[in-house]
Amino acid sequence: MNNPDDLIVITRFLRQQHVLTLCAGSGMDMWCANCFYVFDEAKMALYLMTEKHTRHGELMQINPQVVGTIATQPRTVALIKGIQYRGEITELKDDAELIARQHYCRRFPVAKVVSAPLWQLNLLEIKMTNNTLDFGKKLYWSRLESQ
């Protein structure tokens, strides 16, 4: 069962960060990419911009199931905070794309001059390590358990 206190810490972390590692795969072909993201707390989703013709973009179109990480870069192990996630990604279209693009461009103004597609990564499962709470402390969230 999801712990509401865990979710508070997880969502705060997701709001504070802006770069994720996205890993996509199909069969034995896998690829990772770093992308800027905007967090939509109400939907527990991340919006990101990337081209369809990239290696990870092509893989996401074949298999929308993705995994990845979001992490800080602390100088000491006691300050490590990071998320491992599993999700499903879809290219946004029509009104959903326009709304997400407004949020994305507000956070990253340089994106206003880029015409790359916007994607919605619906988070399905999160495991967060937060050594600032306790060494090796793990926090969890699952979409299935929140429904």
Curated annotation (Swiss-Prot):
Taxonomic source organism: Yersinia enterocolitica serotype O:8 / biotype 1B (strain NCTC 13174 / 8081)
Highest rank taxon of the organism: Bacteria
Family: Belongs to the UPF0306 family.
Coiled-coil spans in chain: none
SUPFAM superfamilies reported for this sequence: FMN-binding split barrel
Gene3D superfamilies (alphabetical): Electron Transport, Fmn-binding Protein, Chain A (2.30.110.10)
Full protein name: UPF0306 protein YE0465
